[in-house]
């Protein structure tokens, strides 16, 4: 009978599953988040509680034997939406603990191939959003950006943008997972955001957005227009939140204006409903956030 490990979806939880597999000498067929668990026929379910001490031991052991790059790769892969990521991480850790430093480079090895493919996909998704994410200033002085990524990369984006805009308050909202990264004063947190409303765009923002869209339209050379090539380099799933790709002129409150409440930013710039801190999101924990996430 096959076994499925079920955990809470955090990186600490995933590392706890790795520890459990070693401690119990089991080889679980699946390691899945509780929110998406669907057991196979006749499969035994084993709920693995998150244990930070166990997670820390796995982290420290992986860094000691395999190098920090291997641990950082685990953090990146855990941001994937692939349901097989848990099993891929376990197989990689087992191989890496035997192989030692450089194991994460053995991308052709059967124990590393799936892991490496997921890591590459997450890094590529992050890279695309670094290019195509667009911020909009709303009343209250906060900059808002929306995204619909194919991996849980908001925490990775927060590391990058917070390091560069450490004096600017901003929010990056994931429309797919209903979570938001909130940065203020150079530090940031991840919160659950089932409701996300923002104040209207500032007058300056509307002027700049209109100018940017006009520049984008005017700088193109009609005779060299190639819509297929553009869609290849800039997939259409990014377009709806890109200022230059909006068909109509920016209207006041291009983000849904709602009954704004004070949120610490001033002037009710952003409301995220009953926001709840995500203390163990894939890369949000101070201890478990890979440095390379930025």
Residue ranges, per PLM feature:
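Short, hydrophobic/amphipathic alpha-helical patches that form generic packing surfaces
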Residues: 13-24, 90-98, 120, 156-163, ...
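Charged, alpha-helical interface segments at or near domain boundaries
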Residues: 32-129
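Cysteine-cluster motifs in flexible loop/terminal segments that predominantly coordinate metals
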Residues: 283-290
């Amino acid at each position: 009978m096959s076994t499925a490990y079920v955990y809470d979806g955090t990186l600490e939880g995933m590392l706890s599953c790795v520890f459990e597999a070693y401690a119990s000498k089991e080889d679980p067929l699946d390691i899945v988040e509780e929110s998406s668990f669907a057991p196979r026929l006749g499969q035994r379910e084993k709920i693995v509680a998150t244990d930070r001490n166990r997670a820390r031991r796995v982290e420290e052991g992986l860094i000691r034997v395999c190098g920090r790059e291997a641990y950082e790769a685990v953090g990146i892969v855990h941001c994937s939406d692939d349901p097989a990521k848990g099993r891929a991480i376990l197989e990689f850790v087992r191989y890496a603990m035997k192989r030692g430093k450089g194991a994460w480079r053995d991308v052709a090895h059967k124990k590393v191939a799936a892991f490496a493919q997921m890591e590459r996909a997450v890094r590529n998704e992050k890279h695309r959003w670094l290019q195509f994410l667009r911020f909009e200033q709303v009343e209250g002085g906060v900059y808002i950006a929306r995204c619909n990524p194919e991996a849980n990369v908001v925490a990775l984006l927060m590391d990058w943008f917070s390091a560069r805009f450490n004096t600017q308050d901003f929010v990056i909202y994931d429309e797919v997972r209903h979570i938001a990264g909130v940065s203020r004063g150079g530090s940031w947190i991840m919160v659950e955001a089932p409701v996300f409303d923002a104040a209207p765009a500032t007058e300056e923002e509307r002027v700049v957005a209109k100018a940017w869209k006009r520049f984008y339209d005017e700088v193109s050379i009609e005779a060299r227009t190639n819509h297929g090539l553009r869609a290849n380099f800039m997939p259409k799933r990014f377009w709806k939140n890109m200022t230059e790709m909006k068909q109509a002129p920016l209207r006041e409150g291009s983000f849904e204006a709602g009954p704004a409440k004070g949120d610490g930013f001033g002037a009710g710039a952003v409301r995220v409903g009953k926001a709840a801190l995500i203390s163990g999101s894939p890369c949000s924990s101070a201890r478990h956030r890979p440095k390379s996430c930025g």
